């Protein structure tokens, strides 16, 4: 089943004013998602340039919401304790190009 994941940064200006440590964390975040992309669980992910504050979006494919939540909670940004938040919502219907 597909799930929608939305990653919220600790502040609206995060993309513009990341510290060097936060940049390294975001590299770990991207590597984590790319690893799961290679495993076939990540369908797509990326940055949304919302003028109110950029956020991350991902579509993932897992057997259960618990598995999707476990994946999201394993993201280095969430484990960092720096104030990132993630929403995981089921997508009971969807259409994929292909």
Explain the meaning of each model-derived region.
Residues 1-98:
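Conserved, structured core segments of small domains
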């Amino acid at each position: 089943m597909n799930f929608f994941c939305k990653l919220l940064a600790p502040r609206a200006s995060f993309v513009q004013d990341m510290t060097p440590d936060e940049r390294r964390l975001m590299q770990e975040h991207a590597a984590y998602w790319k690893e799961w992309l290679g495993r076939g669980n990540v369908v797509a992910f990326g940055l949304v340039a919302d003028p109110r504050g950029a956020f991350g979006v991902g579509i993932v494919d897992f057997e259960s919401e618990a598995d999707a939540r476990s994946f999201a909670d394993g993201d280095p940004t969430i484990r960092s304790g720096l104030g990132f938040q993630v929403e995981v919502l089921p997508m009971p219907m969807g259409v994929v190009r292909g």
